Amino acid sequence: MLKLLGALLILSVGVFSAFVSVQYEKKRLTVIDGWIDLILYIRGQIDCYLLPIDDILSGGDRALFEACMSPSNAADLPAMLEASGIYLDGDAKHTLESFVREIGAGYREEQLKRCDFFISSLRNQRERIAAALPMRVRLCATLC
């Protein structure tokens, strides 16, 4: 009886590990989508109103910040990047670090071009992650 209970416990831990790993892989894609949406929102605000970044973020929808894993919905780009860092690979993290560092500096046209560059770069990375997602999900399920 104890052997059966032990076997069931080991099996349930494996299933739980696989479930958590698959959710993590899907969350990686969701976080990238959240950052793309946030940069699109910031770009639109810069294009229409040319507000400072703090004013843009204070007027943003909380769902934008939640998608980027913002701690307690703080409209603070460095804090959001730090909170979402666990879900970002090296390229995406480097791209977003550059975005956080460069946004708000320069003229309107320059900021719009930089936003377009970061959106394009993140979309390319998102496509790469989305293409690898089924393989990574199968790998997580197989290993666990």
Please identify what each model-predicted range represents.
Residues 2-71:
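Juxtamembrane/interface alpha-helical elements of multi-pass membrane proteins
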Residues 6-20, 24, 31-35, 74, ...:
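A generic structural signal for ordered alpha-helices
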Residues 35, 45-109, 113-119:
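Glycine- and small-hydrophobic-enriched helix-loop-helix hairpins
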Residues 104-144:
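Membrane-interface, cytosolic juxtamembrane amphipathic helix immediately N-terminal to a transmembrane helix
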